[in-house]
Amino acid sequence: ELPKYLLNSTGDEFFIPDSWKFYWDELVGEKHVRYVPNSNHSMAGTDVIDSVDAWYHAIVHNISMPRYSWDVADDGTITVFSLDEPAAVLLWQARNPESRNFMQAIIGKAYTSTPLTEIEPGVYSVKLEPPASGYTAYYIEMAYPSGIDTPLKFSTGVKVVPDVTEYEWEMAPASARER
């Protein structure tokens, strides 16, 4: 039940950007995720250390975390509900015109951000249509005051459109998992 702060790369060489959907609902207790834009697995050259510093400062000094929740709907709509006012809310998106591969080594630093405004008090929402060809990955990032110079940064899970894959997932039989 310890608080969790997951830091994921948008351009990871080993994990797909929307991998959160395979484990997020199973995590118990307080949980936050941040996708670090334009990063590879190492996250070198990003502000990830600042994010850890702000998170650690809040935990050590018993500072209340921002009250928010998020949802990624099947139709691609990403919605953030925030009871505390964020300092900034950004839509991050990247496109690969050829494949569902968002590794930084393939698409470079392709993620761009656009500020989002509330659609009603404390609610931010976005839905991107699938491109005519290729794929688009997108998510919302929220920054909140942390009590130090570096903000607390959290994000939603990443949505990839169109939501299709080249191969179907088949879970291994239970007997294979019992080893």
Question: What does each model-identified segment do?
Answer:
Residues A87-A94, R100, A137-I140:
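Beta-strand-rich binding/interaction modules
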Residues L27-M43:
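Catalytic histidine neighborhood in serine/cysteine hydrolases
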Residues D47, D53-Q93, K109-P121, K127:
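Surface beta-strand/loop "capping" patches
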Residues L6-N8:
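Short beta-strand/loop motif that positions the catalytic acidic residue
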Residues G147-R179:
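Short beta-strand elements
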Residues G11-F15, H41-S42:
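Acidic catalytic loop of the alpha/beta-hydrolase fold
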Residues I16-W24, A94:
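Short alpha-helix in the alpha/beta-hydrolase fold that links the catalytic acid
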Residues A132-G147:
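Short, aromatic- and glycine-rich surface loops/edge beta-strands on solvent-exposed regions
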